C-alpha cells in the first residue's frame, strides 16, 4: 500500500462520493470523431417492453437525422442503450444530441406510463481512437445480446440496427 505524504491532508486525497467529469474537458464532441455512447435506464430493464423499445429505437434514428449526425448503429438492451455515431459535419455538440434525445424519450415514456427519471443522469461516451476503428466498436456493440444470452446471433435481436458494413 502506498503511503500518503505526511503534509497532505486526507480530505485532499478523497475522491469517492465526489462528482467527476464524464466528458473530456477540452473536447466539444462536435468534430470529425466517432463516439460510442452507453446510456443506462434509471430503473431495471424498462426496455423489455416492446412499446418502449420501439419508441427508443425510432428516436435514436430521428435525432441523428434531425441534428445531421452520422449513425453507424445501435443496440438496445433491456436496461441500457449503445449507440455509435459521429457529429462530423453537423456543427452540433454531443451535449445537444444527448439533451434532446433524453428529454424527448423521457417525455414519451411518461405517455407510456413510466415515471421519471427515465435515464440515469450521465452516460458513458468513448471516442474511437486510431487503433480502434468504428467497425471494431460496432462489432462489439452488436454482439451484446449474444453475450447476454438474449439471442443466438445479433441479427436475431430486434433492437439492433447496423447502418455500416462490419
Each model region followed by its residue ranges:
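Short catalytic/metal-binding and nucleic-acid-binding patches
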Residues: 1-166
Amino acid at each position: 500500500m502506498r503511503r500518503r505524504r505526511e503534509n497532505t491532508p486526507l480530505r485532499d486525497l478523497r475522491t469517492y462520493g465526489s462528482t467527476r467529469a464524464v466528458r473530456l474537458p477540452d473536447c466539444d464532441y462536435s468534430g470529425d470523431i466517432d463516439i460510442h455512447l452507453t446510456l443506462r435506464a434509471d430503473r431495471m430493464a424498462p426496455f423489455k417492453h416492446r412499446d418502449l423499445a420501439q419508441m427508443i429505437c425510432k428516436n435514436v434514428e430521428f435525432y441523428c437525422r434531425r441534428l445531421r449526425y452520422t449513425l453507424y448503429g445501435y443496440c438496445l438492451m433491456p436496461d441500457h442503450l449503445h449507440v455509435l455515431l459521429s457529429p462530423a459535419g453537423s456543427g452540433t455538440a454531443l451535449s445537444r444530441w444527448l439533451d434532446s434525445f433524453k428529454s424527448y424519450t423521457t417525455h414519451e415514456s411518461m405517455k407510456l406510463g413510466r415515471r421519471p427519471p427515465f435515464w440515469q443522469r450521465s452516460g458513458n461516451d468513448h471516442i474511437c481512437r486510431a487503433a480502434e476503428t468504428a467497425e471494431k466498436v460496432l462489432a462489439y456493440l452488436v454482439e451484446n445480446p449474444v453475450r447476454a444470452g438474449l439471442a443466438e446471433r445479433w441479427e436475431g435481436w430486434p433492437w439492433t440496427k447496423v447502418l455500416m458494413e462490419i
